[in-house]
Amino acid sequence: MSRAAVFVSVFLAVSCIECSGSHLDDSDWNSFLKNVGVDNSEDEFMNWRRRQDDNFFDDRTPLDEGNRYFSSRFYSPDFERNVDFLTNMVQQLQDRAPSYSLPTSYEQYMPRSSDVSDFGTFDFIVVGAGGAGAVVASRLSEISNWRVLLIEAGDYPDNITAIPNMYLQVDFTRYNWNFATVPQTTACLGMVDRSCTAIRGRGVGGTTLTNGLVYSRGSFLDYNRLAQELNDNRWSYQNILPYFKRSEDFRPTDTTATTVPSVHGYGGLLGVEYHLPRSPQLQAFFAANNELGYQFSDYNDGIGLGHSPAQVNTRGGMTHDTGTAFIMPFLNRTNLRVQLFSYATQIIIDKNKVARGVIFADAKTKRLYRAFASKEVIVSGGSYQSPQLLMLSGIGPREHLESLGIPVRQDLPIGSNLRNHNCYYGLNFRTNYTEPILPTRNVVEQFLRGQGYYTTPGSNQGVAFYESQYSRGTTYPDIEIMFIPANATNELARTSYRMTNQTYQEMWGNIDFTNSFILYINALHTESRGTVRLRSSNPYEYPLIDPRFLSDPANKDITTIFEGVQIALSLMNTTAMRKIDVEIQSHPLTACAQYRLFSDDYWYCHIRQMTWDLYHPVGTCAMSASPETGVLDSEMRVWGIRGLRVADASVFPFTFGGHPVAAIVMAGERVSDLIRQDYGAPTAFYSSG
C-alpha cells in the first residue's frame, strides 16, 4: 500500500480519535507505522511525532512532504498521550509566538542558480491550494485520465491549524505570508508606520487555515448584480445556489438557531456548523437585537439580514479548511500531484499568447523547474499574489510593467481594483458576567472530545447584518456587527494587527478579558479602491499593497461605519444589555483628544485610527463584460491569453454582503464545471443562462 493510500485510510479514523478518543483499527495502525519506518511501540511513535513537529516553528528546513502529511492531525491511540502531546504543542506555540520571525520576502524560495529543470507535462496546472485552488484541483482530478499538478508554496494543515481558537496564534507560524500594506493616510492611523497587516495564509487551504472561519454567502442581490455587470445570467443567485450547496456539508448543531434547510447543502466536502456554546453575553446581544426589532435569522437564506450564531467552517469542532476538505482525502489519486514548498515565478506564454505552463522555485531543492500544461493553467494565488504572478509574466498595466522593464504580453488593469471590507475594531464593553478560565490541559482534553473553548473560532461568536442609509428598504445588507470575545485583544493581537504600543495600551491594554467583549463594525459594500503593484521585476520581493481604506471621495465607507457604531450603541442601551450591566470601556485615544468624547467628530477620528483590513480583499483580477473594464471574462479566462484562468477572491469586481470564503469556494466549484464542460467531461451543473 502506498504512503498516500495509508494516509487516506487512517485520515477518517483520525477524526474519530480527535473527537472521541477512540482507537485506530490495528491493521491501519501497523500499516501506518511500517510506512513511516517506526517500530510498533508507543514510545517510538511519540518520539517520531515530536521529531516531526519540532520543525513546526522552523521555516529554515522545509519538512519531508511524506512525513509531514502523516504527522498532520495524527494522534496516538492513547488518549492521555494525545492530551499531553497537544498541550505541550499549544504551550510551545504560545511561548514562541511573540518572538517568531516572520518572512518579509520570498527569499526562502530563491534557487541556487538560474538553470531550469523539466518537471513534466500535465493536463492542468493549478497555482495555489487556497480557497478556490484546492477545490479546482480536487474537482479536475476526479477525471481519472486528467493529470493535475497543484503547486503550493506552503505545507499541509497540521495539529495547530486544526484548532479553531488558535487562529491568532497561527499568524505567528509559517502558515502566514506576513504581508503588510504601504503607509496609509485615511485609515490604519493607529498602526506602526500607519501600515496595516494584510494576512494571507500559506499552505494547502490558503487563508482558510488562518481566518475566522465565518461562512456567510451574502445577499442574492450581490449575485444578481454580478450577473448584470457581466451580462451573464449564469452568475445570478438562482444559478449559483447549486454550487454553494454542492460543496457544503451543513450540520445544524444549534437546534435553537433559525435555519432554512432548503438553502443548505448536506453531504458536501466542506463542513459548516453553528458556533457553540453561546455565552450569556452573546445571548444578551441577540436579545438586544430582538428588542430593537431586528430578526433572528439564517443569514445564508439568500437575503442576508438578521442576527445569528456564526455559521463556521468546522467539522466536529475542528477547523475544516479547504485543504482538509478537498485535498487531504484524495491524496491517493494517482493523477493528482501536490507539489509543496514551491513558489511560482512566471507563467510560460508562447508567441501566440497561449499559456503553456509555469516556472516555479522549490524551497527544498533550491532549484527552478518548468512544468507544462497541455490544456490550461489556473492561477489561484489570491487577491495579492495572483496579480503579482500575472504582472511578472507580462500581463498587466502597460505603464507599470514598462517602468520595471517587463515585456508586455497583454495590457490589462490587473491589480487596479483592490476592494476590501473596511472594519472598525474600536468598541469595547465590560459586563457583570465573568468567563471561567480553565487550564490549557483541560481545554485540550475537551477539544479532543469535540467540545469546549478550542472548538470555537474565538474571533467571531455571533454576527448581525443590517441595512445602512444607502440600502434602506432594499433588504441589501451593508453593515455587519461581529460579536468578539475580549481575549481576541491579547498581546499577540497587538503584534498581529501592527498596533503601536500607545494605541494598544489606550484601547486594549487594560481590558479584563474575563468579563468583556468587543463589537467589530464592518462596512460591507465599500467604494474605496486600492492597488496591488510590483516592487520590481524581481519575483522574490513581496508586492506593494495599497488598500486606501476609507478613501472614497463621497465618504460613504466611513459614514457607513459611523452608522454601524450608532446601531451598536443603541443595542447597548436596551433592557437586555442592562441586565448584564454593560458599560462602554472609554479609553480616549490621544490622537483624538482634541474632540469631545463620543461626539461625532470624535467617532470619525477614532474610526480612522482603528479601521483596517478584515482580510477580505477582492477585485484585483476582476471579471468584466469587456477587456476595457476588467481582467477576466465571465468564465474566469484572462482576456487575450488562451489557456489561462484565475480562480480566487480576486475575480469578484466588488465586495459582497458576507465573508468571502463561501463565494470563493463556489467560484472554484463553478470554474471546475466550466473547464470540465469545455473538455467534454461530466459536469455537476451547467446552466446555459
Predicted segment positions?
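N-terminal redox-cofactor-binding region of secreted/periplasmic oxidoreductases
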Residues: 2-10, 14-689
